[in-house]
From Swiss-Prot:
Similarity comment text for this entry: Belongs to the radical SAM superfamily. RlmN family.
Enzyme Commission code: 2.1.1.192
Species name: Verminephrobacter eiseniae (strain EF01-2)
Catalytic activity: adenosine(2503) in 23S rRNA + 2 reduced [2Fe-2S]-[ferredoxin] + 2 S-adenosyl-L-methionine = 2-methyladenosine(2503) in 23S rRNA + 5'-deoxyadenosine + L-methionine + 2 oxidized [2Fe-2S]-[ferredoxin] + S-adenosyl-L-homocysteine; adenosine(37) in tRNA + 2 reduced [2Fe-2S]-[ferredoxin] + 2 S-adenosyl-L-methionine = 2-methyladenosine(37) in tRNA + 5'-deoxyadenosine + L-methionine + 2 oxidized [2Fe-2S]-[ferredoxin] + S-adenosyl-L-homocysteine
CDD domains: Radical_SAM
GO annotations of cellular component type: cytoplasm
PANTHER family registered for this protein in UniProt: 23S RRNA METHYLTRANSFERASE (PTHR30544), RADICAL SAM CORE DOMAIN-CONTAINING PROTEIN (PTHR30544:SF5)
Enzyme class, spelled out: transferase
Residue ranges constituting the Radical SAM core domain according to the UniProt record: 98-337
Intrachain disulfide bonds: 105-342
UniProt protein name: Dual-specificity RNA methyltransferase RlmN
Locations listed in the record: Cytoplasm
Active site: 92 (proton acceptor), 342 (s-methylcysteine intermediate)
Keywords: 4Fe-4S, Cytoplasm, Disulfide bond, Iron, Iron-sulfur, Metal-binding, Methyltransferase, rRNA processing, S-adenosyl-L-methionine, Transferase, tRNA processing
């Protein structure tokens, strides 16, 4: 007999489910607390629920995360789990412990259709959106697994970032109920300031998120001009930088923070020159947008054909931004020994969009162009990419 996974529901949805069982809607709050605050999956353990309700639930419902294929711990304390979401697809979630907080990085899709050049997930293509339950299950499993491991009843995960596999705003219908569970005081009680949705720039959905469930927003910028961003983040061809920045300004009217975080992956010789930093200063100044920059050292993977910027170059880049009064941080790479760092999450994806095939063809063409160019160019000029030039 088919049963309903209660992880799929926010509290209102769970109240509707209880009403369909002939139960009072307030029972949903009791049930919701058992599931999310206590991590219970056994209805018999839910001692303050009436026996009749528990018997009904056993016949028609379940509380179940996707099967865990593997769990890996990094030398720095980060933990990565690989979840089997069926049909040959697997997604990853990563816990990153720090002195004052514990952050969980959560996936929203099996694969990603955006196809950013520097992202391992994008090179795998796209299979499907995750359901609300599959998104929240990553938090449900991680929080309670970590509590058991640490032998504590205190909350372990204080921050959550939608920065795992997938573009969250291309799965907004499932994302919104999951966010409501994260924020619900009867669920995980996370602050809106401590839940961050990262997007490559789906402009209409930024506006919808602002209206329906504003949380902290991070934008994957990665380039100071459209010519370069078109190459690194193909979605830019649909929603160019000026449109994106205007959407960010509109978002700030609803956001729990008074700034937007711009993520910027530092790619050697591609987007990391001092001229690029000066262009960024001019860009955000012209847009008059309150922001901070998070510079991310690139985590190489074979298919990318890209290299990490030198540490001194990253610091020099940050200094230009900082001198202009822009708060700038350099992300500390965590979990790279278990392929859990930024841009490395890949899981397993059964590509239904042929994105991976197209990207492979593009890589072949780029390599051929580079070979042809190097044969024609002077040795000292080969392979150099100037500020603002496309790749």
């Amino acid at each position: 007999m088919s049963t309903t996974n209660l992880l799929e529901f926010d509290r209102d949805g769970l109240a509707d489910f209880c009403a369909r069982l002939g139960e009072k809607r307030f029972r949903a709050t009791q049930l919701f607390r058992w599931i999310h605050q206590r991590g219970a999956s056994d209805f018999d353990a839910m001692s303050d629920l009436a026996r009749a309700l528990r018997d009904k639930l056993k016949g028609c419902a379940r509380v179940q995360a996707p099967p865990v294929i593997s769990g890996q711990a990094s030398a720095d304390g980060s933990v990565k789990w690989l979840f089997d979401v069926g049909a040959g697809n697997a997604v990853e979630a990563v816990f990153i412990p720090e002195d004052e907080r514990g952050t969980l990085c959560v996936s929203s899709q099996a694969g990603c259709a955006v196809g950013c050049r520097f992202c391992s997930t994008g090179h795998q293509g796209f299979s499907r959106n995750l359901s609300s339950g599959e998104i929240i299950a990553q938090l449900w499993f991680a929080e309670h697994a970590l509590r058991r491991r640490l032998k504590t009843e205190d909350r372990v995960i204080s921050n959550l970032v939608m920065m795992g596999m997938g573009e969250p705003l291309q799965n907004l219908a499932a994302l919104l109920p999951a966010l409501r569970v994260m924020l619900d005081d009867h669920g995980y009680g996370l602050s809106r300031r401590r839940v961050t949705v990262s997007t490559s720039g789906v402009v209409p959905m930024i506006d919808r998120l602002a209206r329906d469930c504003p949380v902290a927003l991070a934008v994957s910028l990665h380039a100071p001009n459209d010519a370069l961003r078109d190459q690194l983040v193909p979605l830019n061809r649909k929603y160019p930088i000026d449109e994106l920045l205007q959407a960010c300004k509109r978002y700030l009217a609803h956001a729990p923070r008074d700034f937007i975080t711009f993520e910027y992956c530092m790619l050697d010789g591609v987007n990391d020159q001092i001229g690029h930093a000066r262009q960024l200063v001019e860009l955000v100044g012209r847009a008059a947008i309150r922001c901070k920059f998070n510079l991310i050292p690139f985590n190489p993977f074979p298919a990318s054909g890209l290299l990490r910027s030198a540490h001194d170059q990253i610091l020099a880049f940050a200094q230009v931004l900082g001198a202009a009064g822009i708060v700038t941080t350099v992300r500390k790479t965590r979990g790279d020994d278990i392929a859990a760092a930024c841009g490395q999450l890949a899981g397993d994806v059964r590509d239904r969009t042929r994105v991976a095939e197209r990207m492979a063809k593009q890589r072949t063409m780029q390599l051929q162009l580079q070979l042809n160019s190097s044969r024609r160019a002077e040795p000292s000029a080969a392979g150099v990419i100037g500020c603002g030039e496309s790749i």
